[in-house]
Amino acid sequence: MSGFGAAALLSGSSAAAGTRSGSSDSLEKIDMSLDDIIKLNKKEERKQYSPKMKRGLQQNRTQQFRTPGSKWGIQQQKGYGKNHLGHRKKIVGKKRPYGVITGLAAKKAMGSHKGISPLNRQPLSEKNTQRNYPILKKKPNLQRQTEMQRKQIPALRRPAPLSRRIGNKLNQQKDTRQATFLFRRGLKVQAQVQPTEDLDNQAAKRTRQWRTSTTSGGILTVSIENPGAIITPISQKLRLTRTPVPPFLMKKDQSEEKKIPKGVPLQFDINSVGKQTGMTLNERFGILKEQRTALSQNKGSRFVTVG
């Protein structure tokens, strides 16, 4: 563009800018490019037309919710090691020790030692703990009292005769249950139960309450049927309750004569041969062969045995 065009633009922009822009501003704008001049003019226009009262109200509203040194309600730390999200950075290698008293307990403990250096403090003893730490001394006393009360209460409330009667009744009930169970299985049971008056008299004689009696209140006698001991013969068929077995499955009586198995009958006893140490088996068999040949010759049989 020509110099005249630039001068015309500058004059228009200076008129729009108002009284704030002086001769010094116009001289600076001569050296700037057209784009920079347009941007500056827009900024100045925005500043003029934006009302100042609204800005003040908005700032007051935001300041109500903000604290000094905070951004968007998040507290920010100042100095070294701050985190932009508002949380402290963990120091590497440093852990919180166990057993550290915190909160109200720490304030109470520190209240007694305020203004006293650790070197001048009194050593821990029973008297000092009562003075300085009354909370620590109260707890064991309360625990002891509760333990003593627990031990005394059952001793006072224990009704001795009632408990014994209940125990005897339970034993009797147990005996009756056992008797019914065995009776259903086919066993005759006679439960001899002692009367309650005798049991009460026995309980009164005893002095020590905590020892339980070894003898039970009821005596249980069981009689089991033994068929072998009965003299009168009872047929086995009547005794069986199962279904009758068919005759072809029944085992045959062993009274029948045992059939001799087929094979060559030995004419000598092997055990006796083994006992005779002077004669061998070959000699014995040789003698038998000679006897056979002699018998066959006498009978005149057709067969000839070659020795």
UniProtKB/Swiss-Prot annotation:
Tissue distribution: Widely expressed.
Cellular location(s): Nucleus, Nucleoplasm; Nucleus speckle
Keyword Transport (UniProt): yes
Extent of Low complexity compositional bias: 1-25
One Gene Ontology term from the biological process aspect of the record: mRNA export from nucleus
GO MF entries: mRNA binding
InterPro entries from the UniProt entry: FYTTD1 (IPR009782)
Positions with biased composition (Polar residues): 57-78
Signal peptide range: none
Matches recorded under Pfam families: FYTT
Sequence motif: UAP56-binding motif, positions: 26-44
Chain spans, region Disordered: 1-28, 41-85
Domain of life: Eukaryota
Protein keywords: mRNA transport, Nucleus, RNA-binding, Transport
Family assignment from sequence similarity: Belongs to the UIF family.
Function: Required for mRNA export from the nucleus to the cytoplasm. Acts as an adapter that uses the DDX39B/UAP56-NFX1 pathway to ensure efficient mRNA export and delivering to the nuclear pore.
PANTHER family (UniProt xref): 40-2-3 PROTEIN-RELATED (PTHR21038), UAP56-INTERACTING FACTOR (PTHR21038:SF2)
Protein name: UAP56-interacting factor
